[in-house]
UniProtKB/Swiss-Prot annotation:
InterPro entries in the cross-refs: AB_hydrolase_fold, Peptidase_S9_cat, Peptidase_S9B_N, Serine_Prot_S9B/DPPIV
Residues listed as glycosylation sites in the UniProt record: N135, N200, N351, N574, N815, N902
Residue spans, topological domain Vacuolar: 121-922
UniProt entry keywords in alphabetical sequence: Aminopeptidase, Glycoprotein, Hydrolase, Membrane, Protease, Serine protease, Signal-anchor, Transmembrane, Transmembrane helix, Vacuole
This protein's name: Probable dipeptidyl-aminopeptidase B
Organism: Ajellomyces capsulatus (strain NAm1 / WU24)
Single annotated GO MF: serine-type peptidase activity
Subcellular location: Vacuole membrane
Chain spans, region Disordered: 1-21
Primary role: Type IV dipeptidyl-peptidase which removes N-terminal dipeptides sequentially from polypeptides having unsubstituted N-termini provided that the penultimate residue is proline.
Residue runs in coiled coils: none
Transmembrane annotation, as ranges: 100-120
Upper taxonomic lineage: Eukaryota, Fungi, Dikarya, Ascomycota, Pezizomycotina
């Protein structure tokens, strides 16, 4: 799911979005919410004090004039009340009467002045957060507080160098591709990792491009991306890149000759036409590319372009994925695979003719870049995308092959494979001698087959089949991490094979299959730890596999190696420390870029692997700027722990405000994502929105990786299938109850928030909870009914709606009565969200309207996609989250049942002052 692949694949976004320790102030909890029974004078004074405290706050929205909790509405105050004489009583003495009248007028004058000051100094109900002096911890200040701008900008982002390891043309290991670094020579270079430390030596360094610009026929080409050929003689250049969806883009492509430092169009006959994808042959003699959904071949020996397909168009795609395959299967823009010998190309043919379209409207922008027709300037631009929702027709995909020598396309029939309407192709892996492995699943992603195809004989067969639903009730995640292991009799490998991730004893483990058609593997890893996106590297000479595991604790990541026979399991990183690493390996796995991601300040270094006879180490990033900032700022402290719910040990992260005082009462915000296989509780360093909430606003932030999330076992993972939201919401609520019972938690101020799947989980949790534990919720870009989400993702975890209608009904956000029992909730969505359509939010609003539910706020972001970043929207969404949360915990959203007009003198004075203020501001 969207920004969520990052989570499910252990990436940064989160999010999106992805994706420290200790502070100086606590939460804003100085307001007294019991003032409804206080006297008018105390109420006014209290309100003025709070107004003074709020002075300088920016106005965010209209004031709610029905917010009367500072007033005693049971008492009517009128000027005549002071002159009331009981019947039959003695006339009042004149001097006493004068004194009383004087006191009355002084009181009225004071009250009127107080109201005027209140109106002119206070601000709207929608407030910007500030810190109360009452909440400064007794421990004193430990440093500056971070701002929202700090966490939304790049000040706290670790610097991260991306090294592109490059296989040497002559088998060299440890070569890397670098672009325009400090003190470098040339825009694009290939360098030997060992010799580059010697700045006086040019050994092992090849300059491929001196500059990032060149001229072709009078046109200046500016490089957007570059891909050197395997022989390092030519560079494939992309210019004028234009983003399409999350991973796909178009642009102009060029061939740049390294010797002459000159360029030419990839297709000289169509220089200005935009291309969707281009990739090198392993022999460096040709480039295959897709344009207008058709495939073409350019051999470097000729300027002519060979047409491979010609019937591609709106409904038929060749070599590139459609929207749903790009998003949910490949997480990329390519569906083209070169054979190692350069004689064949495998590619997907995608038929979308039966897939329904969904319209994306753009009200402000025109992403097409085209001017509207005359008279249509005031109409929104509409882009129709082929988007298969759950239960709708899927694109039909076929694997086809192109024989370059014969110039023909062919397919290979495989007996007993899935039929067209029940087939997903999720990985294609070339082996040797014309063999290719194809990983397929059924539509619901719970039966896996591996087919072996021989393109030389044009035959194929199924070599492995696994029923995951029967095994543990789970599903198959699409991955592209399988590694081919070629035969090498001199190294005790008589047959070809491959290394894959399999389910073993309830965990994801590595397995070695050899020969290719052997369905019974050798299990390489065992035990409590689970492998993550592995294998990461393979050393064919030494017979070693390198991989990353979620270590002794699920929030850790460590790097290990093991031999092909399953022996000599060794850690590469220091497993005695609770840390989070990731790694990338050189082509021969003799060197590695080791990334320490946390919990301390991240660093990067290039190392030789333990099996390398020539030890090497070079630190390339220490993030000293973050070390300096940590000495100046106060950040939250983090507490990692487990909470047992229904027999499952769930990872929990509690962020505590700096100078945490266990004798105080803190509001609590739960932050979650919670999607299947995802992880949010980890030991990566990060200063994000949650850090701001804990460190600057002074609230406790709790994150729970509940059932269905990753790296806590398949039993927990598979349990959620067919009923998304049920167990996950229960876990959030049960953990929240435990936190509400803690002596340092204010149980009357608890909120929950999330984005995308986390938005769905926010609404599901407050729906299930019905206001008993969580009073507030904030949902960004939420799914509200899985029938509205794309078929491949939704059906993987929910089956089809036809197969599981009750599950879809139960998972949908539909209990409006329960939502009405919360104090208030917030929903935000981008109108141009191509991933989680705004249809989700709009249909929920319709349900709320029909049920007369109004305890919510909505913010819609015009033309923003799932990331919500168009026209300042990224900053606005987090500002709104922060301000709304502060108002919630300040009690600004407390409901008033059956509000009635208040026509008292003081309300009239307040109204008059407000009108006066409005008149003069205008």
């Amino acid at each position: 799911m969207a920004t969520e692949k990052g989570h499910s694949r252990d990436d940064e976004e989160r999010v999106p979005l992805t994706r420290g320790s200790t502070e100086f102030r606590n939460s804003i909890d100085s307001f007294d919410y019991s003032s409804s029974t206080a006297s008018l004078s105390l109420a006014v004074i209290d309100r003025i004090n709070n107004s003074t405290q709020d002075a300088g706050l920016s106005e965010k929205g209209p004031r709610d004039d029905d917010d009367d909790r500072y007033w005693d509405d049971d008492v009517e105050y009128d000027v005549e009340d002071a002159d009331y004489i009981p019947s039959g009583g003695k006339p009042m003495h004149k001097s006493v009467k004068i004194a009383l009248w004087s006191l009355l007028f002084l009181s009225l004058g004071g009250w009127s002045l107080a109201f005027v000051l209140f109106i002119f100094r206070s601000h709207d109900t929608y407030q910007t957060p500030i810190l109360s002096e009452d909440n400064i911890s007794s421990g004193g200040l430990r440093g500056d507080r971070i701002t929202l701008d700090d966490v939304l900008g790049e000040e706290w982002m670790p610097r991260h160098h991306f090294i592109s390891w490059f296989p040497g043309p002559n088998g060299e290991d440890g070569l890397l591709l670098e672009k325009d670094g400090p003190g470098s020579t040339g825009y694009l270079r290939v360098e030997d990792i060992v010799s580059r430390k010697d700045t006086n030596s040019s050994k092992g360094s090849i300059v491929l491009m001196q500059k990032n610009t060149f001229t072709v026929g009078g046109e200046t080409v500016i490089c957007s991306q570059v891909w050197p050929s395997p022989d390092l003689k030519t560079v494939l250049v992309l210019s004028e890149k234009k983003q399409n969806w999350r991973h796909s883009f178009t642009g102009k492509y060029w061939l740049f000759d390294v010797d002459t430092q000159t360029g030419q169009p990839l297709d000289p006959a169509a220089q200005d036409q935009r291309i969707q994808l281009a990739s090198w042959s392993h022999k460096s003699d040709a480039v295959v590319f897709t344009r207008d959904n058709n495939m073409f071949l350019r051999k470097l020996s000729s300027k002519e372009v060979i047409t491979i397909t010609s019937d591609g168009g709106v409904d038929l795609l060749y070599g590139v994925p459609d929207w749903v395959y790009e998003e949910e299967v490949f997480s990329g823009n390519s569906a083209t695979w070169w054979a190692h010998d350069g004689n064949y190309i495998a590619f997907l043919r995608t038929n979308e003719s039966a897939v329904p379209e969904y319209p994306i409207q753009y009200f402000v922008s025109r992403p097409s870049g085209e001017d509207p027709n005359l008279g249509e300037e005031n109409y929104p631009e509409v882009r129709e995308i082929k988007y298969p929702k759950a239960g709708a027709p899927n694109p039909i995909v076929d694997l086809q092959f192109y024989d370059i020598r014969k110039g023909e396309i062919f397919s290979v029939d495989v007996a007993d494979r899935f039929p067209d309407d029940n087939r997903l192709i999720i990985e294609v892996l070339w082996a040797s001698n014309g063999k290719v492995l194809v990983r397929e699943t059924n539509r619901e992603s719970d039966i896996l087959i591996i087919a072996a195809i021989d393109v030389l004989s044009r035959t194929g067969k199924i070599v492995r089949k696994e029923d995951i639903n029967a095994l543990d009730g789970g599903w198959v995640e699409p991955t592209q991490s399988t590694r081919f292991i070629p035969a090498d009799p001199s190294n005790d490998r008589p047959e070809d094979g491959y290394i894959d991730t399999v389910i073993h004893e309830g965990r994801d483990q590595l397995a070695y299959f050899t020969p290719l058609d052997n369905p019974k593997p050798l299990i390489l890893t065992k035990g409590h730890s689970e492998v993550v996106n592995s294998p990461s590297g393979v050393d064919l000479k030494r017979g070693l596999v390198y991989f990353v595991v979620a270590g002794n604790e699920p929030w850790e990541r460590h790097v290990y190696s093991v031999k092909f026979d399953g022996t000599a399991l060794q850690p590469v990183t220091n497993v005695s420390e609770s840390s989070y690493y990731d790694v990338s390996f050189s082509d021969g796995a003799g060197y590695a870029l080791l990334n320490f991601r946390g919990p301390k300040v991240p660093w990067q270094k290039v190392i030789s692997t333990p099996a390398n006879e020539n030890p090497f180490e070079e630190i390339i990033e220490q993030n000293n700027h973050l070390s300096r900032k940590l000495r100046l700022f106060s950040l939250e402290s983090k507490v990692f722990q487990y909470i047992n719910i229904d027999g499952f040990s769930l990872p929990v992260l509690e962020r505590r405000p700096p100078n945490f005082d266990p004798t105080k009462k803190y509001p609590v915000l739960f932050y979650l994502y919670g999607g299947p296989g995802s992880q949010t509780v980890d030991k990566k360093f990060g200063v994000d929105f949650q850090s701001y909430v804990a460190s600057t606003l002074g609230y406790i932030v709790v994150t729970v990786d509940g059932r269905g999330t990753g790296y806590i076992g398949r039993k927990s993972l598979s349990l959620v299938r067919g009923k998304l939201g049920h167990y996950e919401a229960r876990d959030q609520i049960e953990v929240a109850k435990k936190w509400a019972a803690k002596p340092y938690v204010d149980e009357s101020r608890m909120a929950i928030w999330g984005w995308s799947y986390g938005g769905f989980m926010t609404l599901k949790t407050i729906e299930e909870d019905g206001g008993r534990t969580f009073q507030y919720g904030m949902a960004v870009a939420p799914v509200t009914d899985w029938r509205y989400y794309d078929s491949i993702y939704a059906e993987r975890y929910m089956h089809t709606p036809q197969h599981n209608p009750q599950g879809y009904d139960s998972s949908a956000i539909s209990n409006t009565t329960a939502l009405a029992n919360s104090v208030r909730f917030l929903v935000m969505h981008g109108t141009a969200d191509d991933n989680v359509h705004i249809q989700n939010t709009l249909t929920l609003l319709d349900k709320l309207d029909l049920a007369n539910v109004d305890n919510y706020d909505v913010h819609v972001f015009p033309d923003s996609n799932h990331n919500i970043n168009y026209h300042n929207a990224h900053k606005m969404v987090y500002t709104r989250l922060a301000d709304w949360l502060v108002n919630a915990f300040n009690g600004q959203w407390l409901k008033t049942n059956n509000p009635t007009p208040n026509d008292s003198l003081f309300r009239r004075v307040a109204t008059w002052a407000g009108l006066y203020k409005f008149k003069h501001l205008c």
